Design a protein with these regions (language model features):
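Conserved active-site tyrosine of GNAT-family acetyltransferases
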Residues: 16-21, 84, 112
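Short proline/glycine-enriched turn/loop motifs at strand-loop junctions of beta-rich domains
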Residues: 74-77
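Vicinal oxygen chelate
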Residues: 1-4, 25-71, 81-108, 119-129
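Conserved beta-strand-loop-alpha-helix junction that forms the acyl-donor binding cleft
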Residues: 10-13
């Protein structure tokens, strides 16, 4: 089995597509009802409620999720923080080294979906300083 995409349901496809276009530096492909943004390792799909209603009208609500984090591995978290400072309204977590060996920052998209940009950092071997 292969994960094809993570889909975000929104009230405004254009606003969310423009945000992710800036964040991911990829062009959205699609229409006002559904777009895809393909990265080197996966795809983010953005759709309006009308496209979800085709499957089942009660299947998803726009901007109702507070339990999923979209993780993106980047080369340099601090450079990404500088690049995104005018686009992102609030950073939930400024670039911070994590005990599991990554440097992470967290922020939200216009619908409130949580995004984690992280990069791997070297950790000292156990027992060494």
């Amino acid at each position: 089995m292969k994960l094809a995409s993570a889909r975000l349901v929104t009230k405004d496809v254009n606003v969310l597509a423009k945000f992710y276009q800036e964040v991911l530096r990829v062009e959205p492909i699609g229409s006002e009802c559904y777009v895809e943004l393909a990265t080197t390792s996966g795809m983010i799909a953005i759709s309006s409620k009308c496209s979800v209603d085709i499957f089942n009208a009660a299947a998803a609500e726009p901007a109702a999720n507070r339990s999923v984090i979209l993780d993106f591995e980047v080369e340099d978290v601090d450079q990404e923080r500088d690049r995104l400072h005018n686009l992102v309204g609030e950073f939930i977590l400024e670039p911070t080294d994590q005990p599991w060996g990554t440097r992470s920052m967290l922020f939200r998209d216009p619908d409130g979906n949580l995004i984690n940009f992280f990069s791997k950092v070297s950790r000292p071997e156990s027992g060494k300083t």
